[in-house]
Amino acid sequence: MEFSARERLIALIGVLFLFDGAFLLDIPVVREVLGAVVLAVIPGMLILSIFRPGKITLLEYVLLAVGVSLAVLMIGGLLYNNLLLYLGILKPFSGRLLLDCYNVMILALAAVWYLTNKGTSFYLPDPSIKAADAVLLLPALVFLPLSAFAMHLINTTGNNTLLIGLFFAILVYIGALCICHARASPWIMPAALLIMSVTLILPLALRSNYIIGTDTHFEYFTFISTLNNGYWSIIGSAQLDSCLSISILPVFFQIFTGISPMMLFKVIFALIFAISPLIIYSIAKQYLNEIYAFLAAAFFMIQPQFMTATSNSRTVLALLFFMLTVMLLLKEEGMNPLRKKALIVLFIAAAIFSHYTTSFIFFGILVFAWVGTGILSLKYPVRPAPSVDILVIFLALMYVWYALVTVVPSQMFVGFVEKTAENLDQFLMPETRGQDVQRLFGAHLPDKGLPYIIQFVLSWASIGLIAIGTLAMILDRKKTVLPGKEKAEYLKKKFSGLFFVLVITVTGLLGLMIIVPYLSDGYDLARVLPICNTILSVMFVVGGIAIAETLRFVIRYPGERRKREYLTSLPAGQSQLMKMSLAVILLVLLPYFLSATGVLHTLSGDNRDVVFHADGPQYDMKYIHDTEARGAAWLKQRMEPDVRVFADGFGVSRLMSLGTIPHSSLASFVQYGWVSRESYIYLRYKNVVDGNLIDFDGKYRDLDEFAQIFRHKDKVYSNGGSSIWTE
């Protein structure tokens, strides 16, 4: 289908007109859908069309358009906020004013785009669907409504059978795609990935009507404060105020879509991050067959860190920009170098404005990549990447934003480095490592039961595949990386020198997280893994292929074990290699999927996961009841200013999101062991119903241990699931 520039301009203005009408009349569904499209897609599409970065695939175009849109909203929103405040407008983020200014920006971009693309046409692929494509895609289309209905059942009846069945259906679907992939059109794999991605990432977001997580309560407070104030500024925790991903960005989406703030904050980041497996697919497809790229993306998608993205809002946005940057850096052909560099700088700036720690790690990876490719360039025709000017800009932006403007993130980083250095003499003490590292090496494993032992084995099986893939790439580097005519049969093209160095770099980063004392205690290994898996997901698949190559060699050619090259030229051998590779990869991937999602634990009677259960530690700590929300709202309305509120650790976080009470007015009486005379005590559901307290350390304590703090307090509010005490 062909569309002229004029037709596209008319369509764009039509969409904008429809959205404005839906916004002003508050038309349900239309406002929500068009608001999301107008914000998350249109700015990036216009900028890319004006910018013309070069030859990119449709998938890359869509991914870059979303990334550019989000980056422009954050960076442009900050400039807009500061400019209007300077002009004396006290609430830049008010509905009609923001809509008018946004319309002007979009129309200006549209005018520039039309003038620069007046004589061009746009071609869409043939929309017809083959019968085989329909058969492969239709089952996946059922996943999304099933996911929503399954969570409705769990929230209302506690029945998790449908959700377990859904996860088994996804497992079968992945296997079916691997079997039938040769019959599918090229677009089926990314479409299936996106549907499964949203299906897996939504359950936690839909688990209750309120925020689920720990840090996410603090992040929500930053967002709701910006929304209520009508402007952005450093108002509370500078480390959170420095993250525009949880302040300015969700404010745009809330004002434009009209979705309730808490529901929007729970869902929007999950939906945005759902495109991340497609970035993995795009990266992997440069080097591997489509089905291998699909499995690399699937491996990234079934990680626990991916499925809990809704509780790590600022981290996942920074990670998304890191992934887009890596995708651009690894794309060596077809793009204009200067325009590619401009996009990289934009995504780097967006990552800096999203999350400080991820940005520090991001910068470190790029520095080591530059050093590594520089060393390779001394002997091989490899260009050092990224370029020095990108690193200088990255460092300068971090210094300005973290050291001069918001200050606290740089102070935290320096303190973290100093504390890590102070703990180097405790190298042999396991307790100086974080809980994630201790679990990785089986701490307390015999006491936990069979599902945890199986998860431990499967985790190490996946690590084993990654290690084998990395070693195979290094040992067979003449066929996998280094310039020359010889190429491994499973590769479409050889891995670039930059990719090779990135694999070594992120592997080294994981090694440091495990080896260096305090490093994983100060910053969880679980937060670093998604960054590393951006690259290592490809190595997971390569590891499966390497094992299959060895098995094929041993089984089929026992007499030619020293002549490996004999195997690589036969089409039948290549087909056999793919079948064996898929079998090896699925043998690890599918059981690991059941373990990572919590299905295995649930079937064995373990109530670990809040998504499946209405009891257990996660539920006690993170699930919010309606009674707790009503109690927090009552307290917010009636509490006197400058009077402190005490609660247990997870009660403190609830009061920030449910009552929008600043952290400076909150404290844990469990941590301090006392309360001030003029103060409030807030007891949540677990405290009132079960008589248990849970502080920031996750340990359970009896409420009776703190009976003395209620001696001079009276109960002034109770609803059966929360209570409030004061003088």
Language-model regions: role of each:
Residues 66-77, 81, 105-106, 144-146, ...:
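Membrane-embedded helix bundles of polyisoprenyl
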Residues 29, 35-38, 155-162, 177-320, ...:
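Active-site lumenal/periplasmic loops and adjacent helix-entry segments of GT-C-fold
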Residues 25-26, 98-105, 213-216, 312-318, ...:
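Transmembrane catalytic cores of multi-pass membrane glycosyltransferases
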Residues 173-177, 370, 452-493:
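Hydrophobic, aromatic-rich transmembrane alpha-helices
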Residues 2, 6-18, 141, 190-198, ...:
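Transmembrane alpha-helix segments characteristic
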Residues 1-186:
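Membrane-embedded, hydrophobic transmembrane alpha-helices
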Residues 36, 43, 162-170, 315, ...:
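Hydrophobic/aromatic-rich transmembrane helices and adjacent perimembrane loops
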Residues 270-271, 286, 298-299, 315, ...:
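Extracytoplasmic
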